[in-house]
From Swiss-Prot:
<dbReference type="GO" id="GO:0003735">
    <property type="term" value="F:structural constituent of ribosome"/>
</dbReference>
<comment type="similarity">
    <text>Belongs to the universal ribosomal protein uL5 family.</text>
</comment>
<dbReference type="Pfam" id="PF00281">
    <property type="entry name" value="Ribosomal_L5"/>
</dbReference>
<dbReference type="GO" id="GO:0000049">
    <property type="term" value="F:tRNA binding"/>
</dbReference>
<dbReference type="InterPro" id="IPR020930">
    <property type="entry name" value="Ribosomal_uL5_bac-type"/>
</dbReference>
<keyword id="KW-0694">RNA-binding</keyword>
<dbReference type="Pfam" id="PF00673">
    <property type="entry name" value="Ribosomal_L5_C"/>
</dbReference>
<dbReference type="InterPro" id="IPR031310">
    <property type="entry name" value="Ribosomal_uL5_N"/>
</dbReference>
<dbReference type="GO" id="GO:0019843">
    <property type="term" value="F:rRNA binding"/>
</dbReference>
<keyword id="KW-0689">Ribosomal protein</keyword>
<dbReference type="InterPro" id="IPR002132">
    <property type="entry name" value="Ribosomal_uL5"/>
</dbReference>
<comment type="function">
    <text>This is one of the proteins that bind and probably mediate the attachment of the 5S RNA into the large ribosomal subunit, where it forms part of the central protuberance. In the 70S ribosome it contacts protein S13 of the 30S subunit (bridge B1b), connecting the 2 subunits; this bridge is implicated in subunit movement. Contacts the P site tRNA; the 5S rRNA and some of its associated proteins might help stabilize positioning of ribosome-bound tRNAs.</text>
</comment>
<dbReference type="GO" id="GO:0005840">
    <property type="term" value="C:ribosome"/>
</dbReference>
<feature type="compositionally biased region" description="Basic residues">
    <location>
        <begin position="195"/>
        <end position="210"/>
    </location>
</feature>
<comment type="subunit">
    <text>Part of the 50S ribosomal subunit; part of the 5S rRNA/L5/L18/L25 subcomplex. Contacts the 5S rRNA and the P site tRNA. Forms a bridge to the 30S subunit in the 70S ribosome.</text>
</comment>
<dbReference type="GO" id="GO:1990904">
    <property type="term" value="C:ribonucleoprotein complex"/>
</dbReference>
<dbReference type="InterPro" id="IPR031309">
    <property type="entry name" value="Ribosomal_uL5_C"/>
</dbReference>
Length: 210
């Protein structure tokens, strides 16, 4: 295979969406128009850095980390107004964010779902109650170390981030179905280990007779 062919090879998850997931969504929801089948529009990765307003090195580290994780240089987020109690002035840097689209979006989603999330210690799945009512989903990560692109020996500070998957779905139900097909590990609603057995009146009546 030539170098050009490799460079233009379709991302694995994008190919899976086109060849399998679209058909599965069509079967599940019965869309009359194929154009209505939901897809992934963009992914926004946001890293808040409160100390950046007073230490430029902190922001440099955040930019370096998010660039390594996403493969795209982030934009700096600045304070919209001054807050005296936090010694924050309007225009000071408070974080950074990237918006991923196209193949880079699909590649990041694939790495996140297949490599990064499984590396989280005691990971039990993502909360499925964090949709915004329009099929978009946001969740937070408390640190950056689960990403293979981060050299743990060079970590200066643990940094969390918020990740938003923006879809073209019209409802939370459709958005959740799409993300599940993409491989999102949502928590099961009922955990057999934690579920309590429901006992009706007959049980307590027998207990009283004893």
């Amino acid at each position: 295979m030539s170098t050009d062919a490799i460079a233009h090879e379709m991302p694995r998850l994008k190919k899976q969406y086109r060849e399998q997931i679209r058909a599965a969504m069509q079967e599940e929801f019965g869309y009359r128009n194929p154009m209505l089948i939901p897809g992934l529009e963009k992914i926004v990765v946001n890293m808040g850095v409160g100390d950046a307003a007073h230490d430029s090195k902190v922001m440099d580290g955040a930019i370096r980390d998010i660039t390594a994780i996403t493969g795209q240089k982030p934009q700096v987020t600045k304070a919209r107004k001054s807050i005296a109690q936090f010694k924050l002035r309007e225009g000071q840097p408070i974080g950074c964010h990237v918006t991923l689209r196209g193949d880079r979006m699909w590649e990041f989603a694939d790495r996140l779902l297949t490599l990064a999330l499984p590396r989280i210690r005691d990971f039990r799945g993502l909360n499925s109650n964090q949709f915004d009512g329009k099929g978009n989903y946001t969740f937070g990560l408390s640190e950056q170390v689960m990403f293979l692109e981060i050299d743990q020996d060079k970590i200066v500070r643990i940094r969390g981030m918020d990740i938003t998957f923006v879809t073209t779905a019209q409802t939370n139900e459709e958005g959740k179905a799409l993300l599940k097909h993409l491989g999102f590990p949502f928590k099961a609603k009922d955990d057999p280990k934690k579920a309590k057995t429901k006992r009706g009146p007959a049980y307590y009546a027998k207990k009283k007779k004893k």
